[in-house]
Structures are given as C-alpha cells and as structure tokens.
Design a protein with these regions (language model features):
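N-terminal Rossmann-like dinucleotide-binding module
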Residues: 1-50
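Short hydrophobic "strand-cap" motifs at the C-terminus of beta-strands
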Residues: 12, 97, 124
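Beta-loop-alpha module in the N-terminal Rossmann-like domain of NAD(P)-dependent dehydrogenases
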Residues: 21, 54-113
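Acidic-histidine catalytic/liganding microenvironments
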Residues: 28, 50, 65-66, 130
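Short, well-ordered coil/turn segments that N-cap beta-strands
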Residues: 30, 69, 92, 119-120
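Local beta-strand N-terminus motif with an aromatic residue
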Residues: 32, 52, 68-71, 145
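A contiguous active-site-proximal alpha/beta segment in oxidoreductase catalytic domains
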Residues: 101-149
Length: 150
C-alpha cells in the first residue's frame, strides 16, 4: 500500500535528523516544501540536495509563510521553546525533535499554545537508533521477530 504526503512541510534545521526526515518523506511520496536554518548557505545546500523549492533568508519567515502546514523543528534543544512559541502561535502544526522542551513548564506552555491555536504538537521520539532497540531487534520469538515494526 502506498502513501502520499499532501502537506507542505518546512524543516527548521538541516542536521542529520532533518536529512532523515527528508528521506522518509520522499519514501512516502512527499517532500519538504521549505527549509530555514541559522546559516543560510547550509539551508541552500540542504534544499538543493532534496529539491526543496523555498529557502528562507531569516528563520522567522517560516512562521509567516501561509503555504506551510507543518514545521519540523530539529534545532538545538535550548532553542525549541522559542520556535515552538512562534510556530504554534502562527497556527502551524509542529513535529519537534526530542527533547521537545527543557522542562515541564515549557512543555505545559507549548501544549496550551497548541490547544489554543487548534493545531497538533508532537515530539519526534524514536527508539530505533537506541542501542537497546538494536539488541532487541536481534531477538527472535517463535515465528515473529523484533525486527518488524508494528
């Protein structure tokens, strides 16, 4: 069964995990629409690599773009709350890399903003790269295997 991604995603950040998101979207028949990065040249290189049509010269432009549906935040942890505030207040859905915030107060604020603006907020927490998952994936149980993702 194939999937198709109809949403316009923007990546805030161009690091290793942002590359994984770009590849995952492509595998599902979608792609990133735009990218914002602290270093404009890195944003341009990332856009060229993945055929992204828009690169913002200033990070704040991503929050103002009416074409963007979902913002993926993969910046350093200590910047997450400032970008969450802007994205959620702008009415954008957000997928934010772990850890989503530095403390429970920031998380409560982000959840409240998402609720007030009727948008979705999710933390990109995956176990697939953790050493324990790699070890578990080697275990076979009867006919099933932990290698299969459910």
């Amino acid at each position: 069964m194939g999937y198709h991604i109809n949403y316009k995603w923007a990546s805030l950040g161009t690091g290793v995990i942002a590359n994984e998101l770009a590849q995952a979207l492509e595998a599902l028949g979608g792609k990133l629409y735009s990218v914002a990065n602290r270093t404009y040249d890195k944003g341009v290189a990332f856009a060229e690599k993945y055929g992204i049509e828009k690169v913002y010269k200033e990070i704040d432009e991503v929050f103002e773009d009416p074409e963007v549906d979902i913002i993926y935040i993969s910046t350093p942890h200590n910047t997450h709350i400032q970008y969450l505030r802007k994205a959620l207040a702008a009415g954008k859905h957000v997928l934010c890399e772990k850890s989503i915030t530095l403390n429970s107060e920031e998380l409560a604020e982000a959840i409240k903003l998402a609720e007030e603006n009727h948008v979705k907020l999710a933390e990109a927490m995956t176990i697939f790269h953790m050493p324990i998952y790699r070890k578990l994936s080697e275990i076979e149980i009867g006919r099933a295997s932990c290698r299969e993702r459910v």
